[in-house]
């Protein structure tokens, strides 16, 4: 085989290679990974593709063992970039329905949007979910929900089960109906006469 033919074959073979991640360097700028095709060959450090890298940016580092493809211009694998996310031994599909988007994580957490059911479910086995908009913040933990805001308006019937503590003034424009005792400064006010 001539040199030109051998080079041509090498370029074709290197253009797209099925491979998996064998190393990740998150401290590099930009972060990089090394991939292997399962033989003794291991790539140089290469960048990986993300969902978005412009004004909107997405971050997810590929996992060790994650399968994907190395795309190399002119078959030069040293110039390749890795496209992660090929289902296989390292990670089976998290779902198989055509009307959902699903993220599942190793700790048991998940993000599931089902546009047929019009449902978005965030599941954490433990920890914290925080939503911040300017100075307003909602924090959900294993055993509490904390809301911080300048004003909270509720336009609905509100049902509360359990004790209620109010640390501040209370202003009411309608009636107050109570089936139990009404205490004022430690004294029952139920039968107070004017």
Predicted regions and their residues:
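Exposed beta-strand/loop interface patches that mediate assembly or binding
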Residues: 1-119
């Amino acid at each position: 085989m001539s040199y030109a033919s051998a080079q041509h074959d090498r370029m074709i073979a290197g253009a797209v290679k099925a491979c998996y991640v064998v190393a990740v360097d998150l401290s590099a700028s930009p972060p990089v990974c090394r991939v292997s095709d399962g033989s003794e060959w291991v790539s140089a450090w290469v960048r990986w593709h993300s969902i978005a890298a412009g004004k909107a940016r997405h971050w997810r580092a590929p996992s060790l063992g994650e399968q994907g493809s190395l795309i190399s211009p002119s078959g030069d694998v040293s110039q390749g970039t890795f496209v992660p996310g090929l289902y296989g031994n390292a990670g089976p599909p998290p779902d198989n329905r055509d009307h959902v988007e699903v993220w599942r994580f190793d700790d048991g957490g998940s993000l599931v949007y089902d546009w047929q059911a019009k449902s978005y479910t965030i599941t954490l086995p433990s920890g914290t979910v925080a939503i911040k908009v300017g100075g307003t913040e909602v924090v959900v933990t294993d055993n509490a929900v904390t809301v911080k805001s300048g004003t909270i308006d509720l336009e609905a019937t509100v049902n509360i089960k359990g004790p209620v503590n109010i640390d501040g003034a209370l202003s009411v424009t309608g009636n107050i109906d109570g089936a139990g005792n009404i205490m004022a400064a430690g004294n029952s006010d139920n039968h107070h006469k004017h």
